[in-house]
Amino acid sequence: MLLILFLLIALTSSAYSEDLKKLKLDDASAIGTTIQTDIHVKAEGKASIKITTLWPTTICLGEVSGLDVENAKLLYKAKVKSDLDGTAFLEMWAHVGGGQYFSKGMNDVVSQKTDWKIIQTPFLFQKGQRPDKVTLNLVINGKGTVWVDDIVLSKEPLK
């Protein structure tokens, strides 16, 4: 008897489901974010990465493993240029011993229209802490265009 009641409730509850919105992805522009190589705007080398977005987003720029940064400060730096309504900054995720920890460079940002600027975010690894990998992101809090070039990871001794 309980099984019949359960099945009856399960079947009738799905009848009240209502689709609120469908996102058709027939065209990549519907996503609102484009990433492309820009050979005309660059800080060095042959090109930069140009990111244009209609809303806030986080872009993974890469992952690095095998870093020897125990008992050291890891610095994630990049040259960044913007034409933006909002701010953009670097974010680094350190994967250490099964956990994930982050550093957000919210004190070192680009906003509005800026020329090339080096921004950075640090992560401190104590003795015995070694990252399995590090994820390098760019966070855009707003809409507009951000160019990224010349990403550098460096380490400094802890003071």
Regions found by a protein language model. Name each.
Residues 2-12:
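Bacterial N-terminal signal peptides
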Residues 14-159:
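Extracellular and organelle-lumenal recognition/adhesion modules and their flexible linkers in secreted
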